[in-house]
A protein has these predicted regions:
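A substrate-engagement module of RecA-like helicase motors
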Residues: 275-287, 294-298, 303-308, 370-502
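SF2 helicase catalytic motif II
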Residues: 524-541
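Conserved non-catalytic scaffold segment of RNase H-like nuclease domains
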Residues: 4-151, 164-185
Length: 541
């Protein structure tokens, strides 16, 4: 993916495979936040953070409260106080927060501090990162109990829903991703940081599709999920803007999962699929394959060769060249090869280069199966993009590749549609009633911002929204009978794309399941490289 300097910071924090238009959307949020007006979400806001002696709601107590009144993005007033917890602060907590027993010795008690906080807050809307934690500690005593009646907005929910393609939604990572003031894990510093990213989060919600924001706004009543109020207010803003632009009351459409998937693959958002970029012929055992000469492979691993040019610190390794030539020989003679190589040899590039060159020149497909999904992701998101770029620059060809994992790694659109129809419920998690609304909202937003990537990086609490309710199995899949079959389906859409790819990367589990299913699960593939083969036996079905 080509990125300019404007996108570099955000790009470093998005998950691998994030579509270019989504990266651009994220990169524009800071600028949008500077000029937008978010109405009631931007006025009479108090951003709050607390520090405590630990994370136990029953045993631990407050050590610091910090709050800032926010008016249209500007801090107008501060409230900061240490709190005497009535017990020693553990050393590890002091090390984390830089708050010591001497700091709190003469501080107000939790009840006194929360009374002062309540007077400062008044009827303002409260914003906190992981709001349930702060809300519990400031309202569990008589001094702050009245703050239960205020509207609480969880900025962590907003981040996970509006920015699902970020690698992390911790406050410190949001600060870095959007170049906001840096948090030092003191409550006042964290409040300042949250003040800096709060409007960016509102911009991110505003940038979501109108019908999705509207649907999320109605997922749960405010008493079950108070952060839903943000989506209700922004949905109203979006309707108002649409009406203003149209000159009359804008027509609203019900949320459609199918329409959302089609939009993701619209010409404006979607680069040409692999089928238009690659020429992979129908597979046949009689189809001749053309591979490079051994001398070409050897030259590629020289400092100024195809592989050598990929790395600034490249050092030729004899073992890597020997392995690459042996892989080439095995391909050329259609024989099996077992290779054992030590750490640091560069095994993956030693088999990827001859695989890529052979697949490109022959219009065929070569597969790679890894033991772990971590290695699979490294190959697909790190090594193959580098190889694709250098092969294109050298005029060798446009290498296409696809990763395929098992059904359980991808959301099933049919099951997601059932979730959409059923709406959010309250579920009991470790003795607490929790709404499914934020999890459903994050799932739908991820689907909207994703082409065919797996959901392994999606931050969902599967105790709230079980994974089996989102994913399917080969037995459960309705295949052509499913209304989402084809390009809208993560699994079958990705499989269709794989049919035109030069290199197919999968894991041992799916590779051996495909063998057992006599090739039903994966597209026909002429040659296979089984990496980490010493662990293959454990994956046999």
């Amino acid at each position: 993916m080509q990125i300019d300097d404007q996108h570099t910071s955000v790009y470093d924090f998005v998950t691998d495979g994030t579509p270019a238009d989504v990266v651009a959307r994220y990169a524009s949020l800071k600028t949008q936040a500077l000029h937008a007006d978010y109405g009631d979400l931007d006025r009479n806001i108090v951003v709050i953070d607390t520090e405590t002696t630990g994370v136990s709601e029953r045993k631990d107590e407050l050590t610091q409260i910090a709050a800032a009144r926010l008016e249209r993005g500007e801090i107008t007033e501060w409230f900061v106080t240490f709190v005497n917890p009535g017990k020693p602060i553990p050393d590890e907590i002091s090390h984390l927060t830089n708050i010591f027993d001497t700091d709190v010795a003469d501080a107000p008690t939790p009840v006194e501090a929360c009374e002062q906080l309540a007077r400062f807050v008044g009827d303002a809307t409260l914003v906190a990162h992981n709001a349930a934690f702060d809300r519990h500690f400031v309202t569990k005593n008589a001094g702050g109990a009245c703050l239960k009646e205020n509207l609480w907005i969880d900025s962590l929910d907003l981040a996970r829903i509006a920015l699902p393609r970020l690698k992390s939604h911790r406050l410190i990572d949001l600060v870095h991703a959007f170049d906001a003031p840096i948090s030092t894990h003191r409550a006042d510093a964290d409040v300042e940081a949250l003040c800096a990213v709060y409007r960016i989060l509102l911009a991110a919600v505003s940038d979501m599709p109108n019908d999705l924001v509207e649907y999320i706004s109605k997922l749960a009543p405010i008493e079950e999920w108070s952060t839903g109020a943000v989506f209700a207010l922004i949905a109203a803003q979006q309707r108002e803007h649409a009406t203003s632009a149209a000159g009359e009351k804008a027509e609203t459409f019900p949320f459609s999962l199918s329409a959302m998937r089609r939009s993701r693959f619209s010409q404006a958002n979607q680069p040409k699929p692999a089928s238009e970029n690659a020429s992979v012929n129908e597979q046949s055992e009689d189809l001749p394959m053309e591979f490079p000469a051994a001398e070409e492979i050897e030259a590629a691993f020289s400092p100024d060769g195809l592989v050598g040019s990929l790395y600034n610190d490249f050092e030729p390794r004899d073992e890597q060249v020997v392995m690459a030539k042996e892989v080439l020989k095995a391909f050329s003679t259609s024989t099996n090869l077992v290779v054992e190589a030590g750490t640091g040899v560069g095994k993956s590039m030693a088999y990827l280069l001859p695989s890529a060159l052979g697949a490109l020149r022959s219009g065929s497909r070569i597969g790679v199966a890894t033991k772990t999904n971590a290695l699979l992701d490294q190959i697909v998101y790190k090594e193959l993009p580098l190889l694709k770029s250098t092969l294109a620059e050298a005029g060798v060809g446009d290498l296409s590749y696809v990763a395929l994992k098992g059904f359980s790694h991808y959301p099933c659109m049919r099951k997601v549609s059932h979730i959409v129809s059923d709406g959010a419920r309250m579920v009991n998690v470790t003795g607490k009633d929790v709404s499914q609304a934020p999890s459903i909202a994050a799932l739908l937003s991820y689907v909207e911002q994703t082409e065919y990537d797996d959901m392994d990086g999606l931050k969902l609490d599967y105790r709230v929204l079980p994974r089996y309710a989102i994913t399917t199995t080969s037995r459960e899949c309705l295949k052509r009978k499913c209304p989402f079959f084809g390009s809208q389906c993560f699994v079958h859409g990705l499989r269709k794309r794989a049919e035109s790819a030069n290199v197919l990367v999968t894991n041992h589990s799916l590779f051996f399941c495909d063998l057992a299913a006599e090739g039903f699960l994966l597209p026909p593939t002429r040659y296979w490289v089984v990496d980490e083969a010493h662990g293959a036996e454990a994956r046999l079905p």
